[in-house]
Amino acid sequence: MHLSVDSDEFSKIFGKNLKNVGKTFPGVELVHFCANDAHREVWDGYGLPQNLGTTIFWYFIVPKIQEMLKIVGCEYVFLFAADLTPYEELIRYYSDQLKFEKADEHCVAIPMYDFTCQFMSQKTCELEGKRKQFFEEFNV
């Protein structure tokens, strides 16, 4: 619980939505994953078929997660998509390009910071296959 919020205030905010959970899943959160607009033009100049963020994720971030899996238990990689657009462009990007899924079947403890965001996740045991597929289709 956040130190600046006492338990009574927390109960008022969440009321009946405050739940005790019977099971939790080990995971790692991908935080503030976004492209630097100052480098988009440089990346676009290379003429590659994939965008910068997708390439960074599959080429650099996923191998780091795989290294981490050698020493800690982790079942999911997850993020909170800050997408308030009517057509959910960011959510579609995370789904189509990075292979995250909306996790509506799980009850999620959402931090206050991410309260308006969409929780998305994917199983770490599927990352290698998805990464391989990304590189097989890189120049398609």
Each model region followed by its residue ranges:
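Short alpha-helical segment within the catalytic ATP-binding CA
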Residues: T55
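Non-catalytic substrate-recognition and accessory regions of acyl/acetyltransferase enzymes
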Residues: M1-L48, Y59, P63-V140
